[in-house]
């Protein structure tokens, strides 16, 4: 499996969508019998690795550190949980080296809930990823929240059957991660701060770059591909689709229902919420409220109802990003790659 397959997969999807729109056809239901290739999905194929994140669209993935938190997330309506050793806020406060969560904890979470379970690995740490794949997690996050083992090289995700999610601050970073095999992108934001400002900035940068890309000529897109260090087919595909060719979630500092709705309004396909839920004093109510606001983001009345479900007095204590030193910023980790 390689990059050409991901391009072919999305071009065929785009062509099918174009044809249906031209013919005025709306697919309300599928055939009684699916083609054999679709009836028996093969683990590790492009269709499975790219298809799994699509089922998370419109939902919330919640960071958890134990079985109890995973149960709260599932009851609140999360589409998946992300298991890690410490919440990003605690990682920031503790300092030192942040590593993959205990395998036993991940397995306990997997056996206690029915929704998908994701887990984080350090940037460039192939063997943490191989361990997670071997125990059967549904997705791996190669995350800057943990301490990178390689600042210049991310994991070659084409070597794995399990899908990966990576963070990005710009279109260039997002396309480089996709070229490496990422099946999902998330804005980096500034995790563990309870401040959504950086997530907003990163989402606007990515969406703005895509908008400008659509107005470029073929020669100009080739120049952009060289500048980004990615295959020109990926740049062309992104321009044609008018969006990233993989699912794009927002993350980093989301702490309230209004934060989640804002990120969806800016173009996110869903949201990751880390410290915002379980560092608050009302985690159960906040989790349910953020799920409601994310799924009903285009209805201000529904988002207002979600906001009524929480109290600002119980929100996590946020961190002013402007007061962080360059060494304290998590978003810059792995940025050289």
Swiss-Prot record:
Q: Which residues bind D-ribose 5-phosphate?
A: 63, 192, 253, 274-275
Query: Which molecular-function annotation in GO is an example for this chain?
Result: pyridoxal 5'-phosphate synthase (glutamine hydrolysing) activity
Task: Report the enzyme's class at the first EC level.
Answer: lyase
Q: Please name the GO terms of the biological process aspect recorded for this protein, alphabetically.
A: amino acid metabolic process; pyridoxal phosphate biosynthetic process; pyridoxine biosynthetic process
Catalysis performed (reactions):
aldehydo-D-ribose 5-phosphate + D-glyceraldehyde 3-phosphate + L-glutamine = pyridoxal 5'-phosphate + L-glutamate + phosphate + 3 H2O + H(+)
Q: Name one Pfam family in it.
A: SOR_SNZ
Any idea of its EC number? 4.3.3.6
InterPro entries found in the cross-reference section: Aldolase_TIM, PdxS/SNZ, PdxS/SNZ_N, RibuloseP-bd_barrel
**Record's keyword terms, sorted:** Lyase, Pyridoxal phosphate, Schiff base
Record keyword Lyase present: yes
Q: What is this protein called?
A: Pyridoxal 5'-phosphate synthase subunit PdxS
Q: Whose protein is this, by species?
A: Aeropyrum pernix (strain ATCC 700893 / DSM 11879 / JCM 9820 / NBRC 100138 / K1)
Query: Its encoding gene is what?
Result: pdxS
């Amino acid at each position: 499996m390689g990059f050409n397959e991901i391009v072919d997969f999305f071009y065929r999807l785009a062509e099918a969508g174009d044809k249906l729109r031209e013919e005025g056809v709306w697919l309300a239901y599928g055939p009684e019998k699916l083609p054999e290739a679709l009836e028996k999905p093969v683990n590790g194929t492009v269709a499975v690795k790219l298809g799994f994140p699509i089922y998370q669209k419109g939902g919330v993935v919640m960071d958890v550190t134990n079985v109890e938190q995973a149960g709260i997330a599932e009851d609140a309506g999360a589409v998946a949980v992300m298991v890690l050793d410490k919440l990003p806020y605690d990682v920031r406060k503790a300092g030192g080296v942040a590593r993959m969560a205990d395998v036993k904890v991940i397995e306990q979470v997997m056996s206690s809930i029915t929704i998908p379970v994701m887990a984080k690995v350090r940037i460039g740490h192939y063997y943490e990823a191989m361990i997670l794949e071997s125990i059967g997690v549904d997705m791996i996050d190669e995350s800057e929240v943990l301490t990178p083992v390689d600042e210049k090289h991310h994991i070659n995700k084409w070597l794995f059957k399990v899908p990966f999610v990576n963070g990005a601050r710009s279109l260039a970073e997002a396309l480089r991660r996709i070229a490496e095999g990422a099946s999902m992108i998330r804005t980096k934001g500034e995790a563990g701060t309870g401040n959504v400002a950086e997530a907003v900035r990163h989402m606007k940068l990515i969406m703005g770059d895509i908008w400008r890309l659509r107005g470029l000529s073929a020669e100009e897109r080739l120049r952009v591909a060289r500048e980004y260090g990615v295959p020109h087919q990926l740049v062309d595909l992104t321009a044609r689709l008018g969006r990233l060719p993989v699912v794009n979630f927002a993350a980093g500092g989301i702490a309230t229902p209004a934060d989640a709705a804002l990120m969806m309004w800016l173009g996110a396909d869903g949201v990751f919420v880390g410290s915002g839920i379980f560092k608050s004093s009302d985690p159960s109510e906040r989790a349910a409220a953020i799920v409601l606001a994310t799924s009903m983001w285009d209805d201000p009345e529904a988002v207002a109802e979600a906001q009524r479900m929480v109290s600002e007095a119980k929100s996590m204590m946020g961190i002013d990003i402007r007061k962080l030193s360059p060494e304290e910023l998590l978003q810059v980790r792995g940025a050289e790659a």
